[in-house]
Amino acid sequence: MHALAGAARDLGNGSMELTSRGNIQFRSVSDPDELARRLAGAGLLPSSTHERVRNILASPLSGRVGGVSDVRDLVPELDEAVRATAELADLPGRTLFALDDGRGDVIVASPDFGVQAVGPSNYALVLAGGDTGVRLDESEVVDRLLESATAFVRLRAGEWRLSELDDGPARVLEMMGLSPSEAAHLPVAVEGVPPIGWLTQVDGRVSLGGALALGTLDARLAEFVAAIDRPLVITPWRSIVVCDLEEGMAEEVVRVLAPMGMIFDENSPWIDASACIGSPGCDKSHADVRTDLTDAIAEGTIERGVRQHWAGCDRRCGRPKGDVVDVVAGPTGYRVF
C-alpha cells in the first residue's frame, strides 16, 4: 500500500480508485513506464504477459468471519497457475475468476470461471455465473479452473466473456470431459453485502471494514492505512478490510481513519451510492455527477437502503449489478429509472 500511495501521489492525480473487481485504478498518470517500474518493484506486477487476465475475486472475509470453507490458500495457488500457463495469456481482459467460500458474496459477480464452497472441502463448479452441477474436491479446484479457462481460449472467436459464447458452459464442460447436471443447483444470490464496520474474527481478533466515498482512496489516507501494518483486503464493493487487529488497536484505527474519510458506519448512504467518472473527466458526460451526488448526500436527500448509481450519460459506466436505481444525466437534467 505504501508503494501504491507513493505512485498515486507522484505519478497520478493523488488518489486511487477501487473497482468492482477488487482492483486499484490510477488516473492522470504522467509517466506510465515509471508507474510500471514502481509497481513491479513492489511485487505488484509479477507477470508482463498475464497481468490483464489475473482477475481473481475471493470472499473477502474467508477464514476470518463466516463462510463454509477457507479459500485464502486457493487465491495465490490459482494466480500462480494462471501465470504459469502460457495459453491463458490469450484470455480476454474482461475474464473473471471467483473463489467463493460458500456465502455467495462473489459468485454474484457472474464470473466466467469459479467455484463456490458447498462443504469444508467441496466446491460447485460455476461457469458463466451459473452452477454447472459439477462438484469438486478442493484438490481439483485450481486444475479444473485452468482447464475451463483453456477451453474458452480454444473455443472463442472474439467473445469477451464465456456468457457471450453460444452454449459456452456446456461446450467447455464437453472439452473437459464433464457433463452438466441439474441436480442440487446452488441458489442464485442477487447481490453481495459489503462488510462494513467492526467484524469479530473466529480467532477473537477484529477485522474492520471501511467504505470510501465514490470508492476513492487518496494517497494520504492510503499511507495511514499502510502504516497499520496488518493484512488488507480490497473488496469488490470498493471498500477495504483491515484484518487481524487486537481490540485496542481496532479502536485506535477507527479514531484515526474515520475523520480522514474511511467510513465504518454500515448505515452511511455512501454504502449504496456509486457514480461514473462524469465531467470533467469524461467528454461524454452531461454533468459533474460525482459533485452532484456528494451534494445530494450532504443535503440528506439520499438514504441508506436504496442502491443508486449516478451516470453522466446513457452508457451508465460503472453500474453495479443487481437492483439499482439509475440517476442519469442528460442535456436538460437528470432522469431517474
Regions found by a protein language model. Name each.
Residues 1-126, 131, 135-139, 143, ...:
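Small-residue-enriched alpha-helical segments and adjacent helix-cap loops
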Residues 116-193, 223, 337:
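An acidic, glycine-/histidine-flanked metal-binding catalytic module
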Residues 176-234:
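Extended macromolecule-engaging scaffold surfaces
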